[in-house]
């Protein structure tokens, strides 16, 4: 009886410990990493947004493109087509921001 109680307490302590050590910050800030990147160019007409992955917790820097079909694709930020796509998306997003003020 004493051994089963001890094992039960040990199991509970083991289950609770990682949650306490992780703390509230680990729960509120999930980290997205790219482990593989696409090899082929994605046409800019298929892309609608992007975000950069620069976390020190990730094995590599990357850009995640979101397509018009809401798929996320990891790409190498050093690739020329990736830089061109980012520039294009930046310009089109600025155009959309400025349009309402131009209407008067």
From Swiss-Prot:
Compartmental location: Secreted
Domain of life where this protein originates: Eukaryota
Molecular function per GO: CCR2 chemokine receptor binding; chemokine activity
Keywords noted in UniProt: Chemotaxis, Cytokine, Disulfide bond, Inflammatory response, Secreted, Signal
CDD domains assigned to the protein according to its UniProt record, in alphabetical order: Chemokine_CC (cd00272)
GO cellular component terms attached to this protein's record: extracellular space
First and last residue of the signal peptide: 1-22
Cystine pairs: 33-58, 34-74
Induction: By interferon gamma and lipopolysaccharides (LPS).
Record field: transmembrane: none
One of the GO biological process terms: inflammatory response
Tissue: Predominantly expressed in the lymph nodes and thymus. Also found in the salivary glands containing lymph nodes, breast, heart, lung, brain, small intestine, kidney and colon.
Subunit record text: Homodimer.
Protein family membership: Belongs to the intercrine beta (chemokine CC) family.
Function: Chemotactic factor that attracts eosinophils, monocytes, and lymphocytes but not neutrophils. Potent monocyte active chemokine that signals through CCR2. Involved in allergic inflammation and the host response to pathogens and may play a pivotal role during early stages of allergic lung inflammation.
Protein name per Swiss-Prot or TrEMBL: C-C motif chemokine 12
Species for this entry: Mus musculus (Mouse)
Gene label: Ccl12
């Amino acid at each position: 009886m004493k051994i089963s109680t001890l094992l039960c307490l040990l199991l509970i302590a083991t289950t609770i410990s990682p949650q306490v050590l992780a703390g509230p910050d680990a729960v509120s800030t999930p980290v997205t990493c790219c482990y593989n990147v696409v090899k082929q160019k994605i046409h800019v007409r298929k892309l609608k947004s992007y975000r950069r992955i620069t976390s020190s917790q990730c094995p590599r820097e990357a850009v995640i493109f979101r397509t018009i079909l809401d798929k996320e694709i990891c790409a190498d930020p050093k690739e020329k087509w990736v830089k061109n796509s980012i520039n294009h998306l930046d310009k089109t997003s600025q155009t959309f921001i400025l349009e309402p003020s131009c209407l008067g």
